[in-house]
C-alpha cells in the first residue's frame, strides 16, 4: 500500500477516539486485489476507498501541519479527479500556448533553469524576480513532489506543471511562503484554476493569528478572488519563454494585480508592536 495512503489511513484511524464507528474506515476494506496496472512510470493506481482515505487523511494532516508538502500534494491529487484536473487540461487544450506546453512537456527544475543565467537578467525581469524570490525565501525549484495518484498520464503532467509553476505565482505576486502568504496564494489559485486542494487549503486560515486572520479577510481574500477571477488562466503561461520579459508587463498581460507586500506589512507590524512594548515598559518604570 502506498506510504501516503497508509498515512491517510493512520490519520483517519485517530478519529476512532472521538467519532462514532460509522465514520471510521476499517483497514479490512482496503485491498490491492482490484488495483489496475500503472499507466506511466511512478504511477500508483488507487481503489476508490484508498483514494477517499488519501483525501481525508491528507486533508486532516495538512490542516494540522500546513508545512507538510507531501500531504498537500497527495490532497491535490486525490481531489483533482474525476472532474477538475480534466477541466484544467481542457483549458490548456483550448489555448494555443497551453497546447504547446502539453506537446513540449517542459519541466521546471535546477537542471532546466540556470540560476546563474536568471541572476544575470535585468532586476525587473520575470527570471530575476523569480530567482530573487527563491533566494529571499530560501527555497529552490527542486522541492516539488512527483505526481503519482492521477490515473490519466496527460492529466498527471498537467498537475505536475501546475505544481512546478507554483513558485512563479509566488514570485509574480510577491507573496512569501509563510502560512499567511500560502493561504492567500492558494485562494488566488482556487479562483483561477478551481482545483479543490487550493480551496481546501483556505481552511488553514484557522491557524493564523487573530491579526493575520483579520488581514486575510480584509485585504488578501478580496485581492485573491478579484485577481484570480479576472486574470487569464496561469496554467497556460510558458514561463520558460517569459524569463526576459518585464515582470510588470507580464502582470498586465495576464491581468494579475500585485497585492500589498506581505513581508513589509509583517515587518511594520512587528516594529509597531516592539515600539508599543517599549513605550509601556518605559511608562511602567
Swiss-Prot record:
Binding sites annotated in the UniProt record for Zn(2+): 166-167, 170, 182
- Catalytic function, reaction form: a 4-hydroxy-3-methoxy-5-(all-trans-polyprenyl)benzoate + H(+) = a 2-methoxy-6-(all-trans-polyprenyl)phenol + CO2
Q: Which keywords does the record carry?
A: Lyase, Membrane, Metal-binding, Mitochondrion, Mitochondrion inner membrane, Transit peptide, Ubiquinone biosynthesis, Zinc
Lineage: superkingdom:
Eukaryota
Q: One GO cellular component term, please give it.
A: extrinsic component of mitochondrial inner membrane
| InterPro entries to which the protein is assigned, alphabetical | Coq4, Coq4_euk
Identify the EC number(s).
4.1.1.130
How is it placed in the membrane, per its record?
Peripheral membrane protein
Tell me its cofactors: Zn(2+)
**Where is the protein found, in the record's own terms?**
Mitochondrion inner membrane
- Presequence positions on this chain: 1-11
- Pathway where it operates: Cofactor biosynthesis; ubiquinone biosynthesis
Q: Which GO terms describe its biological process?
A: ubiquinone biosynthetic process
Subunit structure and binding partners = Component of a multi-subunit COQ enzyme complex, composed of at least COQ3, COQ4, COQ5, COQ6, COQ7 and COQ9.
So what does this one do? Answer: Lyase that catalyzes the C1-decarboxylation of 4-hydroxy-3-methoxy-5-(all-trans-polyprenyl)benzoic acid into 2-methoxy-6-(all-trans-polyprenyl)phenol during ubiquinone biosynthesis.
Spell out the family assignment given in the record's similarity comment. Answer: Belongs to the COQ4 family.
**Protein name per the record:** Ubiquinone biosynthesis protein COQ4, mitochondrial
Q: Which organism is it from?
A: Paracoccidioides lutzii (strain ATCC MYA-826 / Pb01)
Task: Write the lineage as a comma-separated list.
Answer: Eukaryota, Fungi, Dikarya, Ascomycota, Pezizomycotina
Q: Gene encoding this chain?
A: COQ4
Amino acid at each position: 500500500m502506498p506510504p501516503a495512503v497508509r498515512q491517510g489511513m493512520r490519520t483517519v484511524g485517530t478519529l476512532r477516539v472521538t467519532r462514532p464507528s460509522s465514520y471510521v474506515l476499517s483497514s479490512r476494506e482496503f485491498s490491492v486485489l482490484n488495483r489496475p496496472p500503472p499507466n506511466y512510470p511512478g504511477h500508483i493506481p488507487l481503489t476508490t476507498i484508498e483514494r477517499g482515505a488519501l483525501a481525508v487523511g491528507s486533508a486532516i494532516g495538512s490542516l494540522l501541519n500546513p508545512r507538510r508538502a507531501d500531504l498537500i500534494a497527495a490532497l491535490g491529487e486525490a481531489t483533482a479527479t474525476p472532474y477538475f484536473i480534466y477541466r484544467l487540461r481542457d483549458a490548456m487544450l483550448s489555448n494555443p500556448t497551453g497546447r504547446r506546453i502539453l506537446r513540449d512537456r517542459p519541466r521546471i527544475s535546477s537542471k532546466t533553469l540556470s540560476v546563474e543565467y536568471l541572476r544575470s537578467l535585468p532586476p525587473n525581469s520575470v527570471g530575476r524576480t523569480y530567482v530573487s524570490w527563491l533566494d529571499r525565501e530560501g527555497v529552490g525549484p527542486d522541492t516539488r513532489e512527483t505526481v503519482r495518484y492521477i490515473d490519466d498520464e496527460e492529466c498527471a503532467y498537467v498537475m505536475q506543471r501546475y505544481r512546478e509553476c507554483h513558485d512563479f505565482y509566488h514570485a509574480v505576486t510577491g507573496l512569501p511562503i509563510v502560512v499567511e502568504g500560502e493561504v492567500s496564494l492558494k485562494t488566488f489559485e482556487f479562483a483561477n484554476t478551481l482545483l479543490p486542494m487550493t480551496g481546501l487549503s483556505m481552511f488553514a486560515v484557522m491557524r493564523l493569528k487573530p491579526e493575520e486572520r483579520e488581514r486575510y479577510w480584509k485585504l488578501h481574500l478580496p485581492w485573491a478572488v478579484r485577481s484570480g477571477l479576472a486574470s487569464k488562466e496561469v496554467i497556460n503561461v510558458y514561463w520558460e519563454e517569459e524569463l526576459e520579459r518585464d515582470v510588470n508587463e507580464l502582470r498586465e498581460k495576464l491581468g494579475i494585480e500585485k497585492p500589498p507586500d506581505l513581508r513589509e506589512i509583517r515587518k511594520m507590524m512587528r516594529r509597531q508592536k516592539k515600539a508599543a512594548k517599549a513605550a509601556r515598559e518605559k511608562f511602567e518604570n
